[in-house]
Amino acid sequence: MAAGALRGLPVAGGGESSESEDDGWEIGYLDRTSQKLKGLLPIEEKKEKFKKAMTIGDVSLVQELLDSGISVDSTFQYGWTPLMYAASVANAELVRVLLDRGANASFEKDKQSILITACSARGSEEQILKCVELLLSRNADPNVACRRLMTPIMYAARDGHTQVVALLVAHGAEVNTQDENGYTALTWAARQGHKNIVLKLLELGANKMLQTKDGKMPSEIAKRNKHHEIFNLLSFTLNPLEGKLQQLTKEDTICKILTTDSDREKDHIFSSYTAFGDLEVFLHGLGLEHMTDLLKERDITLRHLLTMREDEFTKNGITSKDQQKILAALKELQVEEIQFGELSEETKLEISGDEFLNFLLKLNKQCGHLITAVQNIITELPVNSQKITLEWASPRNFTSVCEELVNNVEDLSEEVCKLKDLIQKLQNERENDPTHIQLREEVSTWNSRILKRTAITVCGFGFLLFICKLTFQRK
């Protein structure tokens, strides 16, 4: 009985009798263990509640648990912090709360930064933009790269977030950084078919000539993935907007990029300036001068015009007759690229027939269009500098470009002459070959005429550029 009564009491360890001594040690040991578990359970329960609150996005419960002592930088599975998880689901409100509580915006786990997580999050662009803006305001590095050397701007470009791309650049993100495969943000946008991202990156100074590790440019990546509009856009050499936003301050860039459509319709100072130049030359060459004001009012650049679909033409008030002229000109500009270096010797010999002649014809036709464009701009250019209504840069800039054009035309003329001599040499060798069956004289004469016309056209284009250069120098 006494022993039984003793078992029911909280006896301390180290009693008199052997029985009570054993029981007392056990009771004392169990008491300390139970007290330790009781101290841990509330913390574990809080952590579980915290995880659930983060999962369902319960901001008030998250704040309550943070007030109760949960660390804002506690880690979840795989070592993620609450801020990284909130960024991964693009929960801007949770991101703001955690940052206000002192969460580390520069935290990384296995080369995965919180900013990269936000840029690659699944959610609306509006929410992703808010998260990225909050992280950048807490000095998150916009150029930090993951294990594959991809930066936040590459993820944003890949996923088609135009405003996020612009915001990152405004905070110092490098546009032309390349990942482990040589992809830039522009390459990723071209690969995924994000036309607006491509246009925006070109405005921000993206280099469309940078090649991947396997020697492909963004235009070739777009063509390989069947994004023909983007291929045409990147293949077109004129770029009136390239790098226009690079010289703006961070505040100006953010203002330009993040304005609403209504704001853009009200303010055309910037857009009108950038649209002036190549667009007018192109329209003059097609006899579509009457469209200049319409396109400038709608902030349509030359690149945009050349990549429009039929419904976009109609939406912007462009008549079917004018559409046909633009589409015909665009079709003439699309010369199918022939990669001679990738072909075998036998294939090269096969290419040198009708397809090569077609290539020369198209080249000759394009030179003719360039001559017409220069002639039009010469006739339209004011003789008196006081008649120029828009503010121009220093005339030296124009003359230096004209000098480069003249040099390029001279180089082109030299290469065409080399091509002509080479073909003439091959033709003479074939004529002197006794085993060769002579072609009809008409074909030979026709080929010679084509080559002569091409050479004359190139020389004429160089002469016109030389006149244009002298005109600028006189001014």
UniProtKB/Swiss-Prot annotation:
Domain SAM span(s) in chain numbering: 272-334
Keywords: ANK repeat, Cytoplasm, Developmental protein, Differentiation, Meiosis, Phosphoprotein, Repeat, RNA-mediated gene silencing, Spermatogenesis
Listed SMART domains: ANK
GO CC annotation: pi-body
Signal sequence interval, chain numbering: none
PROSITE patterns: ANK_REP_REGION (PS50297), ANK_REPEAT (PS50088)
Gene Ontology terms describing biological process: cell differentiation; male meiotic nuclear division; regulatory ncRNA-mediated gene silencing; spermatogenesis; transposable element silencing
Keyword Acetylation (UniProt): no
Known partners and oligomeric status: Interacts with DDX4, PIWIL1, RANBP9 and TDRD1.
Protein name, per record: Ankyrin repeat, SAM and basic leucine zipper domain-containing protein 1
Gene name as annotated: ASZ1
